[in-house]
Amino acid sequence: DYASMGRIVDRIRVMAYDYWFAGSAPGPIAPIEGVRGLVDAITGLVPPEKIDLGIPTYGYDWVRSVSGTCPAEETPETKAIGTARAARTVTERGITPSWDPVAQERVFTYVDTLAGTDANGAPVTCTVDREVRYLDAVAVHRRAWLAHREDLHGVALWALGNDDELTWDGLRAARLG
């Protein structure tokens, strides 16, 4: 009951992310229209100056498909990936991430080849098709700008340590208007 909470608390941190998650199919982490809708709904119940908008500094590296037989010690899994790690993956693999204009997030795909042995010691190889979605500095800026424009108290990043210096540039730019 946000209205009741809004009357008695000093601050509410709204988790405006994980719309799609590790256990789901690939999709946006914090689609901008979903975030806007959430802000509109909550500011109708709680004074904006009591709200901190949660912004993720991570994404997910989903497994889209696997072909072949993977090594016994390497089961492909969907995993969380920090913004800084996503940026390193892009650089290391020479990938140019796309901008999802609807979600306003970054997305890229890549293929991993895993080689090793199966449980019986026989050599095996599998190919893992992966999709990564994450919020870069531009995406963080757009959500922080939304918080600024709606006169929210501020933002809360999840989680510190996943970010990179460009994330902070995006936040500073949003604060300046």
Task: Go through each PLM region and give its residues.
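Substrate-binding surface in catalytic domains of secreted glycosidases
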Residues: D1-R93
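Second-shell loop/turn segments in exported
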Residues: G23-I29, D129-R133, L157
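Soluble non-cytosolic domains of exported or imported proteins
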Residues: I29-R36, Y134-H141, N162
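Glycan-binding loop/region signatures in secreted carbohydrate-active enzymes
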Residues: T57-L146, R175-L176
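Acidic/aromatic/glycine-rich contiguous surface patches that form carbohydrate-binding/processing clefts
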Residues: V138-G177
